[in-house]
Amino acid sequence: MGLIAFLILIGVLVWVHEFGHFLMAKLFRVKVEIFSIGFGPPIFRRQWGETVYQIAALPLGGYVKLYGEEENVHDPRAFSTKKPWQKILIALGGPLFNFLFTILVFALVYTAGVEVPKYLKEPVVVGYVQRDSIAQKIGIKPGDKIIKINGYEVRTWEDLRDALIRLSLDGVKETTLFLERNGEVLHLTIKVPNVQKGEELGIAPLVKPVVGGVKKGSPADQVGIKPGDLILEVNGKKINTWYELVEEVRKSQGKAIKLKILRNGKMIEKELIPAKDPKTGTYFIGLFPKTETVVEKKPFGEALASAVNRTWELTVLTLKTIAGLITGKVSFQTLGGPIAIAQIAGQAAQSGFIPYLVMMAFISLQLGIFNLIPLPILDGGLILLFAIEWLRGRPLPEKFKEYWQRVGLAIIITLTIFVFINDILRLLR
């Protein structure tokens, strides 16, 4: 499932990107010799008109080969005869279409309707405070309502989540949080959790300990716990929230626990031994909470505006992440390559068509931004070269261009090897 979802995703996104270059080239009457999805030997090849369309064996990218791109040809249909500003627009076509595709997909998703957890759209009323968390250390309590953080108005849990991500990516270490408690407004100084390292504020909405799903083969599944069960006690201790259940399971350190459960008006008890997650080292029993969801639908005009806004927000977050990688605030271990993308694609596809589309739109945006980085071989590097030629009023020396391409190839190969190693290490952890 993951491989098929990955191949479809890569195929669509590469087609979108290369089609942008293709259309821009046609706009300026440049002959396109080859339109390829993938690299290496072709497994499908067909010529229509003056262009050969092909699917190649290695599905990790694609290209359009333009007439006169690699050598100076004195022909009005050749890329080499075009003005620098025209070359810039042809190079810009791919990333531009990635951005437009992202906006279009988001608009269609918002029009069709997005299913989101209901609590994300609700006010930030604290239902649970994690032990030894940032929130507990500064005195946040259940029942507190967070209304503002660092000047950002917080109306919903979604607002709080986005604000914390922005602050973390901006490198803010401490900030002021405003909350309402018993009719009073309090302001607290908090440490901003580092989202890149997986840190959290340590609060959650009130989620009742009602079972929404059971992982197949898990300890809970083996003893017959079912969706709809209400967990009342763990080892004789009453619990009121899902997070208390999680905390008690983790505290068990693998020792047997007893659960008191309400099922269809009857009290039952189950005894089970929590399993240890080899990746995180924490104990679990394989239960998922029952989460209420709402479907958000918007008219197409409103959906389009929301799509543009969401694309802009994600672009800013991505640029901040890139800046964090350069300054060292974000670890390079967070980078993922084809293996990670295949895993994510498979998970999204299993979640449904809409989550898969959202994930595809997000990766399309990443692809567009990545290609605009002014590195040799990438579209951004070509745009930089053409801009320099425009300012100089004459082409750059061929030897410089060759050296520029070699440097770019070395950088891309190094980065590719790095993300592959990262992916493999992530699988082993």
Curated annotation (Swiss-Prot):
Q: Which cofactor does it need?
A: Zn(2+)
UniProt-listed GO biological process terms: proteolysis
Q: Where is the PDZ domain?
A: 189-265
The way it spans or sits in the membrane comes to: Multi-pass membrane protein
Membrane-spanning residues: 88-110, 369-391, 406-428
Enumerate the active-site residues.
Answer: E18
Annotated Gene Ontology cellular components are:
plasma membrane
**Keyword Oxidoreductase: yes or no?**
no
How is this protein named in the record?
A: Putative zinc metalloprotease aq_1964
Origin species, per record, is: Aquifex aeolicus (strain VF5)
Phylogenetic lineage = Bacteria, Pseudomonadati, Aquificota, Aquificia, Aquificales
